[in-house]
Amino acid sequence: MAIHLYKTSTPSTRNGAVDSQVKSNPRNNLIYGQHRCGKGRNARGIITARHRGGGHKRLYRKIDFRRNAKDIYGRIVTIEYDPNRNAYICLIHYGDGEKRYILHPRGAIIGDTIVSGTEVPIKMGNALPLTDMPLGTAIHNIEITLGKGGQLARAAGAVAKLIAKEGKSATIKLPSGEVRLISKNCSATVGQVGNVGVNQKSLGRAGSKCWLGKRPVVRGVVMNPVDHPHGGGEGRAPIGRKKPATPWGYPALGRRTRKRKKYSETLILRRRSK
């Protein structure tokens, strides 16, 4: 990813750093409108997810997470920006005339060919079942349920690793550090998701953040006591507690939020590390 730095004529351009190569030119038959209802609110209009709201209107790009065009070679025609995710997407022209979007694998360029199936080369961008992959393969866009499409390791720069195969299950290590079991018949895509340097971008100003639909984040220590447990005091005061707390009074550090008795509890061999 090429980071473009502007001439320092204003504070926003002095501090901004954006990608200068990838543009957005979506195909009309692969996009459709979406109604972004709520934006962090529930049916009563109450804020349930803070720091969300506003943002530019978006058109949803239909992404092929299933990769079910078996044994049909496709060619990467364009690499485009997608406002609905931090990873880039590729437009694929298949040999039978069909056109689809997929997640952009790291290192893939325009003109590369990809294919999905059971006996395909272990090559970046190819999709195949876990049972046909050698141990140690770097993968992304991993299925949890057979035929449902990839659900894991889809963010920019995400990569998982196939570390074991035993019986009907395969063991993979996810980007979060979690180690879990998945059916060997589920498919995944070889390689790492592109746009690895997304965290190197600097928006440079608050307005660019608002375009993304992200509202300002205010520290609890500068709020009033009615708004946050850290609030109150004369001038710059400490939080007044032994440990930090959330706006609702729960411990902010170390409290587990995962639901108990979840169906996947027996499939997780090691919980994610922070």
UniProtKB/Swiss-Prot annotation:
Protein family (similarity comment): Belongs to the universal ribosomal protein uL2 family.
Subcellular location: Plastid, Chloroplast
Keyword Plastid assigned: yes
Gene3D superfamilies named among the record's database cross-references: 2.30.30.30, Nucleic acid-binding proteins (2.40.50.140), Ribosomal protein L2, domain 3 (4.10.950.10)
SUPFAM superfamilies documented for this protein: Nucleic acid-binding proteins (SSF50249), Translation proteins SH3-like domain (SSF50104)
GO cellular component terms attached to this protein's record: chloroplast; mitochondrial large ribosomal subunit
Keywords of this entry: Chloroplast, Plastid, Ribonucleoprotein, Ribosomal protein
Descriptive protein name: Large ribosomal subunit protein uL2cz/uL2cy
A GO MF label: transferase activity
Protein source organism: Aethionema cordifolium (Lebanon stonecress)
Gene designation: rpl2-A
One Pfam family matching this protein: Ribosomal_L2_C
Region of interest (Disordered), residue spans: 1-25, 224-274
Subunit record text: Part of the 50S ribosomal subunit.
PROSITE patterns: RIBOSOMAL_L2
One annotated GO biological process: mitochondrial translation
Domain of life: Eukaryota
